[in-house]
Swiss-Prot record:
Cytoplasmic-side positions: 1-47, 100-238, 289-688, 740-759, 819-830, 886-890
UniProt keyword Transmembrane helix present: yes
GO CC terms, sorted: membrane; plasma membrane
Induction remark: Expressed under control of sigma-F (sigF).
Positions in the Extracellular compartment: 69-78, 259-270, 709-718, 783-798, 850-864
Lineage: Bacteria, Bacillati, Bacillota, Bacilli, Bacillales
Official protein name in the record: Calcium-transporting ATPase
Length: 890
């Protein structure tokens, strides 16, 4: 039912209730049984045990588990235990990162009011909000949070803050009249109060028409549960890589066994050789190293005031091509601010933003003293006197108690020197006629220390212009002629073109002791002037948008505000290009999902949108192949935040719902912080590419060593445990250190990666194969030289091959830091890498020279002379390629 279109009689009949008696306890019980408690349903929670086991569903992990079974079956228990340990550690890391996952619905539920005043059996009773049922009569006043969806039947100067639900920062004036328009957006339903919104002024009475999941908040909860959770590009690429590697490993195993049996070798030894190759083909440490690299990136992002809630999403930011940003509280400060004051034919600009009383006044671009400009003085003082709000400094922040528009006027007055103490000690409010939606104004009668009295009225400019017979001009009150009215209207249009909300102030001196009625007070006034008010953009957002544009990322503003307001803010932020389009909620309703996908690329601003629209917009960009980041802070943003490839919420002003639905929380609510997060995300992905290149080139080298040996009818140069040691220990430490590499200088000048870019894109596959080939050749040559020198001492030749392979890979790691040459970057820029390489060399020496480990790893001590051979062979692959690149450049 469309309750907002009903009159009071039809409403009471439809809900079967009484304004005098409310509901009986018997009727309440019946309706509770029918509709259920007034609570939001919770989604199914994943148990800790299931969450832990979910960590082992990754394809690469399954491959490693298969390798464990094969190793155990063949009696290679050391290999099996080592692989199991790696898999288990990786699972624990993933479990603890995701433990605090799906809490969105619980946070949404906690927004509900704990208690409300309801009319039951003729008496007003305070009850838990969960006991409300459709048909309950409820009342609410300033400061209350609405407990259910309510059709208002009585409104006294009622204004409700709906920014968390609709995105609008200005409180909505509410009334009890029925609406005649059939199709209105949520923000335009002015005779309803919605669950979770806050009363900022006045009081009201209403009939509950929706509870629990049948509320506007409940619909958001439904969308939140149905919004999908997408895998990240990194997860998809690693899944693809895992499948490639398992196919390679299986083919190699079959090939080795078949060739070996044909050559006359026994089946068991050939199967052992096949498993060795399979182990060599799969980088066992890759899942753990990816997890650690992401974790290290998370730690760096925390220092930059970004908290990552879902680990793989770090990388997603790096390939985001669209940022869909909520305007209110994200691009703007959600703190109404006076920026213009017009009086006596002059317009003053007011600097500063928010509620901090800090900012200068300028006239014709020159800073002025407020004391020298009487019209400005009066505008500021009267704005503070005709005001019921208060601003206090709490924990270093200026906090508003009351209406945001009044907060803006109060702040402007304090900037001009009219402190709270000054106003209260010099003026006394004798009478007040509160604001109501019918009059569209508020009036006070004040008295100063000289017992002079003034009527001061503030309100809608068109209303005050009708009530004013004079206007303050050139230092005195003059006739409010048609010429002056035309000038005032021109100023109004100019301020409106800048998306400023205008408040007019008028006054009239009265006799000492006189206290006129409201009707007498609000006529024959003198128009003093206008204040232009806006929710100002965050100062750092413009630069952040520019840098995102340079990085190939389009920023899209999505807001519940009116088109003109959104357009002005977008232009101020330089977000809207000349060819850019603006689309409102009505236009969105007329387009199907497919039609929106066709036109969405040209749109930069979406205005008057609902939560359903935000979800539709995000999906449209995703259908066009974009990786979408959605930023926001309100309840209304949560479904779209969850649907997006990465959801970004605000840490201070953000609701719990938005935070729990998001993957990334900006601690300082600073839109510009997202730029740093994007930079870090890109760097993390590049670092992951670096260590994938490093690990796979090492594995290619290991595979080729084994294949060369078989083709040349040589014994195995490496045993499985040595290969496993290289993959997990020797390779692992440098790979992790590569994950800590600093970004290259042009990382934010590059276009976003294509979402479907493969792991081996940008010649990575060639680099892996070419480097791996040379590492394999160097290792097998070292093995052949030593083996032919003394065929009886196979363990010594295998140790030489082991040492050559390790050192060749450790030298190669420095080549992986750059897309060009090992000489293009200073190796000492990454001290972690220097430490990792030295540690790996030390561990290699321990395995070779420590007697208790020698039988386990099949190693023996190497003579000093043979170390020259090992070092020389190890250096050949990297420096040979580096030399050829330098020659090619010349």
């Amino acid at each position: 039912m469309k309750f907002h279109e009903m009159g009071q009689t039809d409403l009471l009949e439809a809900t079967n209730t009484s304004m005098k008696q409310g509901l009986t306890e018997k009727e309440v019980k019946k309706r509770l049984d029918k509709h259920g408690p007034n609570e939001l349903q919770e989604g199914k929670k994943t148990s800790a045990l299931l969450l832990f086991f979910a960590q082992f569903k990754d394809f690469m992990v399954l491959v490693l588990l298969a390798a464990t079974l094969i190793s155990g079956f063949l009696g290679e228990y050391v290999d099996a235990v080592a692989i199991i340990a790696i898999v288990f550690v990786n699972g624990i890391l993933g479990f603890f990162q995701e433990r605090r996952a799906e809490q969105s619905l619980q946070a949404l539920k906690e927004l509900s009011t704990p208690h409300v005043m309801a009319l039951r059996e003729g008496s007003w009773t305070k009850i838990p909000s969960k006991e409300l049922v459709p048909g309950d009569i409820v009342k609410f006043t300033s400061g209350d949070r609405i407990g259910a969806d309510v059709r208002i039947v009585e409104a006294r100067s009622l204004e409700i803050e709906e920014s968390a639900l609709t995105g609008e920062s200005i409180p909505v004036v509410k009334h009890a009249d029925k609406l005649k328009k059939p199709d209105v957006s949520l923000g335009d339903i002015t005779n309803m109060a919605f669950m979770g919104t806050i009363v900022t002024r006045g009081s009201g009475v209403g009939v509950v028409v929706g509870t629990g999941m049948n509320t506007a908040m409940g619909k958001i909860a439904d969308m939140l549960e149905s919004a999908g959770t997408l895998s990240t590009p990194l997860q998809r690429r690693l899944e693809q890589l895992g499948k490639i590697l398992i196919v390679v490993a299986l083919l190699l195993t079959v090939l080795v066994v078949a060739v070996g049996v044909i050559q006359g070798h026994d089946l068991y030894s050939m199967f052992l050789a096949g498993v060795s190759l399979a182990v060599a083909a799969i980088p066992e440490g890759l899942p753990a190293i990816v997890t650690v690299a992401l974790s290290l990136g998370v730690q760096r992002m925390i220092k930059q005031k970004s908290i990552v809630r879902k680990l793989p999403a770090v990388e997603t930011l790096g390939c985001a091509s669209i940022i869909c940003s909520d305007k209110t509280g994200t691009m703007t400060q959600n703190k109404m601010t006076v920026t213009h004051v017009w009086s006596g034919g002059k317009t003053w600009r007011v600097a500063g933003a928010g509620y901090e009383p800090k900012g200068s006044f300028t006239l014709n671009e020159k800073e002025i003293s407020v004391n020298e400009h009487k019209p400005l003085q009066q505008m500021l003082l009267f704005g503070a006197l005709c005001n019921n709000s208060n601003i206090e400094k709490r924990d270093g922040e200026y906090v508003l108690d009351g209406d945001p528009t009044e907060g803006a006027l109060l702040t402007a007055a304090r900037k001009g020197g009219f402190s709270k103490e000054f106003v209260e000690s010099n003026y006394r409010v004798i009478e007040e006629f509160p604001f109501d939606s019918a009059r569209k104004m508020m009036t006070v009668i004040v008295e100063n220390q000289d017992r002079k009295r003034y009527i001061i009225t503030k309100g809608a400019p068109d209303v005050l212009m009708q009530r004013s017979s004079r206007i303050y001009y050139d230092g005195s009150a003059a006739l409010f002629s048609n010429e002056r009215k035309a000038e005032t209207e021109a100023v109004l249009r100019h301020l409106a073109s800048q998306a400023l909300r205008t408040i007019a102030v008028a006054y009239r001196p009265i006799k000492a002791g006189e206290t006129p009625s409201m009707e007498q007070a609000e006529k024959d006034l003198t128009m003093l002037g206008l204040s232009g008010i806006i929710d100002p953009p965050r100062p750092e957002v413009r630069q952040a948008i520019k840098e995102c544009r340079e990085a190939g990322i389009k920023t899209v503003m999505i807001t519940g505000d009116h088109v003109e307001t959104a357009k002005a803010i977008a232009k101020d932020l330089r977000l809207l290009p000349k060819s850019g389009k603006i689309m409102d909620g009505k236009m969105l309703n007329e387009l199907s999902q497919e039609e929106l996908s066709h036109v969405v690329e040209d749109v930069y601003v979406f205005a008057r949108v609902s939560p359903e629209h935000k979800l539709k917009i995000v999906k449209a960009y995703q259908e066009n192949g974009h990786i979408v980041a959605m930023t926001g802070d309100g309840v209304n943003d949560a479904p779209a935040i969850k649907q997006a490839d990465i959801g970004v919420s605000m840490g201070i002003t953000g609701t719990d719902v938005a935070k729990e639905a998001s993957s990334l929380v900006l601690v300082d609510d600073n839109f510009a912080t997202i730029k740093s997060a994007i930079k870090e995300g890109r760097n993390i992905y590049e670092n992951i590419r670096k260590f994938i290149r490093y690990l796979l080139a090492s594995n290619v080298g290991e595979i080729l060593v084994m294949l060369f040996a078989m083709l040349l009818a040589l014994p195995l140069p490496l045993v499985p445990i040595q290969i496993l040691w290289v993959n997990l220990v020797t390779d692992g430490l440098p790979a992790m250190a590569l994950g800590m590499d600093q970004p290259e200088g042009d990382v934010m000048k590059r276009k976003p990666r294509h979402p479907k870019e493969g792991v081996f894109a940008r010649k990575l596959g060639w680099k892996v194969v070419s480097r791996g080939f040379l590492i394999g050749v160097a290792t097998i040559l070292a093995f052949i030289i030593v083996y032919h020198r003394n065929p009886e001492n196979l363990a010594y030749a295998q140790t030489i091959a082991f040492a050559t392979l390790v050192l060749a890979q450790l030298i190669h790691v420095f080549d992986c830091r750059s897309e060009t040459s090992v000489f293009s970057r200073n190796p000492f820029q990454n001290l972690y890498l220097i430490g990792a390489v030295l540690s790996s060399i030390l561990l290699m020496l321990v395995v070779i020279y420590y007697p208790p480990l020698q039988p386990i790893f099949h190693t023996v001590a190497i003579t000093p002379g043979d170390w020259m051979l090992v070092i020389g062979m190890s250096a050949i692959p990297t420096f040979l390629l580096a030399g050829s690149l330098l020659t090619r450049k010349k």
